[in-house]
Design a protein with these regions (language model features):
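A SIS-like phosphosugar-recognition module
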Residues: 1-179
Length: 179
């Protein structure tokens, strides 16, 4: 599985997902140290439930080349409730009335996890954080920095250099001198 999707079930983790894509891409997309093979794992950062409709179909029924990591938040520190409103012809949705919005988000996440587990051959894991705090996000960042280093060792790349990025910088410097 050469594609890893992080499916974070909170818009507050949007920038974490962007950081993960940058970290994973620049650290793992390289030549192997002891061979001429190009290797790397393609990172994709998704926000649930927004990206369920655009990307879940690809994960469920597309090429089996993706693993998925879900990130859930137990306490959103937000008491927003779904209003107690009955809409004509949509009475079946009344079960959502007075439900905390955060509970709906986590139930959606749980349902997607269950659907993927039913597929039986899509690797997935789940990270649950208590709440979005500096300490918890710092721990998540530290975990991914360590994980990236370990994966680099497994696929035999130096996670701490950027030869592909450097090549573009060298060409840019040369072009700027020509101005």
């Amino acid at each position: 599985y050469n594609i890893n999707c992080i499916f974070a079930y909170s818009e507050t983790l949007k920038y974490f997902c962007q950081w993960y894509v940058q970290l994973w891409g620049e650290s793992l997309g390289k030549h192997q140290r002891n061979s001429a093979f190009h290797v790397g794992l393609t990172p994709i950062g998704l926000i649930g439930p927004k990206d369920q409709h655009s990307f879940l179909q690809l994960i469920m029924d597309g090429t089996r080349d993706k693993s998925v990591t879900f990130i859930k938040i137990e306490d959103f520190h937000d008491n927003t409730m779904i209003p107690d409103i009955t809409l004509p012809h949509l009475e079946m949705l009344d079960s959502l009335n007075n439900l905390p919005f955060s509970k709906l988000i986590n139930k959606q996440c749980d349902s997607v996890i269950e659907a993927l587990l039913d597929q039986n051959n899509i690797p997935l894991d789940t990270i649950t954080i208590q709440s979005v705090t500096e300490s918890n996000i710092g721990s998540l960042i530290f975990y991914y920095e360590l994980l990236t280093s370990l994966v680099g060792e497994l696929i035999d790349v130096n996670t701490y250099d950027q030869p592909g990025v450097e090549a573009g910088k060298i060409i840019l410097k040369r072009k700027l001198k020509e101005l």
